[in-house]
Amino acid sequence: MDATEFRKFGKAAVDYLADYLENLRDRPVLPSVEPGYLQEMIPKEAPTQPETWQDILQDMDRVVMPGVTHWHSPHFHAYYPTANSFPGIVGEMFSAGIGCIGFSWITSPACTELEVAMMDWLGKLLNLPKEFLNCSDGPGGGVIQGSASEATLVGLLAAKEKMVKILQADHPDWDQGMIKAKLVAYTSDQSNSSVEKAGLLGSTPMRLLPTDEKCRLRGSMLEQAIKEDRENGLIPFYVVGTLGTTGTCAFDDLEELGPICNRENLWLHVDAAYA
């Protein structure tokens, strides 16, 4: 595909998506297909020759759309909002078109600095203390993660590393292996499955704590778990609260959890699904 064909395909794709989103309310939210439906509609082997973009658009209607759950439909009331928008789609187009990899400043200065600026904007909108901002003299500054699941895992790994450094500074004779074997994290039994998976990937026990009658994690439940684990020689270090759990849309009581985490020196990560 050359630039001329790309222009045609791109304009046709924009028209397709605009029509789709404009008429989304007329589509059934859930697809009426059975598991494995798509395998019967596509070749068994990867094509050896490319298809035209016109054929690809036809395949969108014939193969893909029948199996789509329409998250942006006004009739969709499950899970959490995904915040799609026309400007967001155009932003994704620019991101994909430029296609830079921003793992360091020199790989794409604009990518790195735009992320820093946007996260500072968000911090100011949330009225966070200046210590949380990149423009302060402290260690603050935000980083955009690829998904909520990734953010939970990265938070766990960062909290784990921080706790190991703190304990080794206080107890130079303690080795990392001994410390990590005693670390324990907490979340509610209503949290997303990705939280428990973060514990598995981070080689850390993730205790699923019981919730109250409104399916919320409360401070008393966390305090009891911390007390039990400390008495058993374990080291609490990480708590995951949720704003809008997947199954029940429960909001954990952060006003109770926050002070406990401060007092006990635990890292509090919030899965802000409904933020």
Residue ranges and their predicted role:
Residues 67-69, 175-178, 260, 271:
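A general structural signal for short secondary-structure junctions and capping/turn motifs
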Residues 1-140:
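N-terminal entrance/gating region of PLP-dependent enzymes' catalytic architecture
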